[in-house]
């Protein structure tokens, strides 16, 4: 079983941090680096077609420095290791300040596209197994009006027609979680 609490915590924390973006919009010169450019990108994107909005957000977020999750080891009172935590999900706000790894890129794109009016029901943060990376990897899946699915990956241009190399494990948005593992 997977623990989806990190995703729901990010959704709640993002809502709490929205006031930071509003403050940047009202007082742009008080905002640091990527937060200032975020407001500019959102304003610029509002006048673009849906496809151009998606392309702009994808390029903007993918320019953010990659920062792998830190490994945190957990020990019991006797000093024996009892667990390791590797993945911490970041909000859009935290991602813009600190950078992040694949799930943070997907989450940042998700929240930016929602801000631009793309329906939550058309978006999924998807945890996959990537044959190219030989490991787990998160991407953003976006359903287009023609029902095609685009994948927004932190490592590649938008994949509009091919999803080869990705095995979907689970997907989520603010409405639900989907388990894509095969049951044998």
Where are these regions (language model features)?
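A structural boundary/capping signal
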Residues: 1-184
């Amino acid at each position: 079983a997977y623990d989806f609490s990190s995703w729901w915590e990010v959704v709640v924390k993002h809502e709490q941090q929205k006031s930071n973006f509003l403050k940047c919009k009202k007082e742009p010169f008080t905002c640091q680096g990527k937060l200032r450019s975020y407001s500019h990108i959102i304003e610029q994107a509002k006048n673009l077609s849906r496809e151009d909005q998606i392309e702009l957000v994808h390029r903007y977020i993918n320019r953010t420095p990659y920062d792998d999750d830190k490994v945190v080891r957990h020990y019991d009172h006797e000093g024996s290791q009892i667990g390791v935590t590797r993945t911490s999900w970041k909000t859009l706000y935290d991602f813009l300040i600190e950078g992040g790894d694949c799930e943070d890129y997907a989450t940042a794109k998700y929240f930016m596209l929602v801000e631009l009016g793309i329906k939550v029901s058309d978006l999924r943060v998807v945890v996959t197994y990537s044959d190219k990376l030989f490991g787990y990897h998160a991407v953003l899946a976006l359903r287009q009006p023609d029902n095609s699915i685009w994948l927004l990956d932190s490592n590649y241009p938008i994949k509009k027609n091919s999803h080869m190399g990705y095995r979907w494990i689970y997907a989520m948005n603010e409405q639900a979680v989907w388990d894509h593992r095969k049951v044998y």
